[in-house]
Amino acid sequence: MFIFKRWKIRKITKRIKAMQANRVSNQPGDEVLKKEILYYFELATIFKKLKNHKKYPYAEIMMIECYRAAANLDDSAANFQLGQIFLGEAKYRQKLDNEGIFNSQANLKRAQQLFDEAHAHLIAAEKLGHVGAKRLRGLCIINGWGVESDKNAGFELVVDSIEQEGSWDKIPQIFASMGLNKPEFFSAIMQRRKGTS
């Protein structure tokens, strides 16, 4: 099975190199770009499965680079994935600093870099029309992850994302997936909805 994955990585990498070379000399169509983005996502999925494998110690880095290459082609889903990855690591580093055992200036600096990069990717995904990115950025603003905490601005982004998606009937599921199961969040969102109506 591992031999098959190695073969698949080589095959996809070869196709991506050919598409990149073609992009340098020609203006590719939308279908070609979509196909290249799909190859990046397929490669990222393979590397995600190979995390912590002794023959691929840098699989996680390769997965991130696959998403980064797809994001360079203006893919909203890739930007959203990168935003989630960087936000998760930044929150973990912030938690380490708050616990006090592993607090260092280098850790705080790296956490801030990750927060900045996460917000940049979430904003890029939001500009490309990704509803989940707008929602996650709203959650970041509500909780003060990498930015100054502002509940009003955060709730506005969450309400805008729900409006954009037209999913007012799915609010309980959306809140559960975001970790906003508290009644005060639900009442604040409903007040915002009444305010926009």
Regions found by a protein language model. Give the residues of each.
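Short helix-capping/linker turns of helical repeat alpha-solenoids
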Residues: 26-29, 35-36, 48-50, 55, ...
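Small-residue (primarily alanine) positions within well-ordered alpha-helices
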Residues: 44, 70-71, 78, 118, ...
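TPR/TPR-like (Sel1-like) alpha-helical repeat modules
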Residues: 149-166
